[in-house]
Design a protein with these regions (language model features):
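Low-complexity segments
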Residues: 1-80
């Protein structure tokens, strides 16, 4: 997996970095276009299955089921 620079990530008010793991529920505020990341192929990540999206959370990418908000996979430290 590659690492890239990117625009500074701004957490919504009341949120700060936390290390997400598979099975946790991501708050609904992050299940929006503002946090979706479509450049996963350039990082060597696989396409999300139907109903899921790669979501940026600080330096990490989370694969999240959009119906449940459950984290399905995590790529740590993708963004510098």
């Amino acid at each position: 997996m590659g690492r890239i620079g990117g625009p500074a990530f701004r957490y919504p008010p009341g949120y700060a970095y936390q290390r997400w793991t598979v099975g946790l529920l991501l708050p609904a505020i992050f299940l929006s276009q503002a946090y979706y990341y479509d450049g996963y192929a350039a990082l060597g990540l696989y396409p999300p299955p139907p109903g899921s999206r790669w979501v940026r959370y600080g330096p990490d990418l989370l694969l999240v089921n959009l119906t449940t908000g459950r984290v399905e996979d995590v790529a740590y430290g993708v963004f510098l």
